Amino acid sequence: MNIGIIGLGLIGGSFGRTAVKAGYTVYGTDINAETLEKAQLLKAVDYVLDTDNAGKLDVLISAVNPSDFSSVIMPYLQFLKKGAVVMDFSGTKRGVVEVMKRFSESYPDLFFIGGHPMAGREFSGIDKSTATLFNKASMIFVPVKADIFVLDKIKLFFISLGFSEAVITTAENHDRMIAFTSQLCHVVSNAFIKSKTAREHFGYSAGSYNDLTRVARMNSDMWTELMLENGDFLSEELETLLNNLGEYLEAIRNRDRQKLKELLKEGNDVKELIDQRRK
């Protein structure tokens, strides 16, 4: 299988390294010439992707910000062979899916599937890419135009790269869930670390501090775009969180032992219930 990747940062670079290691042939490109050179040195790509060799691809993946999807994919579409699959790896889906729908009308011989590998690091760039980033990760698929045979083939391809499970959903549900499981976590971590006490934490912190602050480090350009793209769902989650925090604050300020105990027990019980369901 021949794979094309546009955008060779942390995600695109890691995916390329994983695919090359698994024995697939990877064609890749990046707007940054230095990144492309590093990708070749790190064995994230076998060949540089261009319109001359795009016809060899079985799968073409965009691993750039959602706002750039249309402009980076469009030049290659007319050169792809019949039955090729076009995917994206962006962190929000509604906007990209609408673009895919338009492209699918213009290119009826191609298949289009939105994708989101649920893996990442607090760092960015090809330098931080690894061939193990996706081990046991979940892969989310948002089919736009793909029959069951194509979807099964793509699922098996991702499983062969080390992904542990495949989730098929809609763009709307993807964005609703990601607002909670990913974007809200980054906002909370980023806001938490702004406490003046953070600069004095050395010697006073352990696992809980490290867990909560890991994703405070982020690519601010990318995350700004993702959060604003998903602003409706993220705003709802933030409002819920602020209301919940307000209850804790009130109980603590009022030294209301019973209320605080109830709040803490509620959170503990919800966590235990969720963990049991996961098993």
Annotated model-derived regions:
Residues 51-80, 84-87, 91:
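Rossmann-like NAD(P)-binding element
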Residues 74-127:
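Rossmann-like NAD(P)(H) cofactor-binding subdomain of soluble oxidoreductases
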Residues 131-214:
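Internal alpha-helical scaffold of NAD(P)-dependent oxidoreductase catalytic cores
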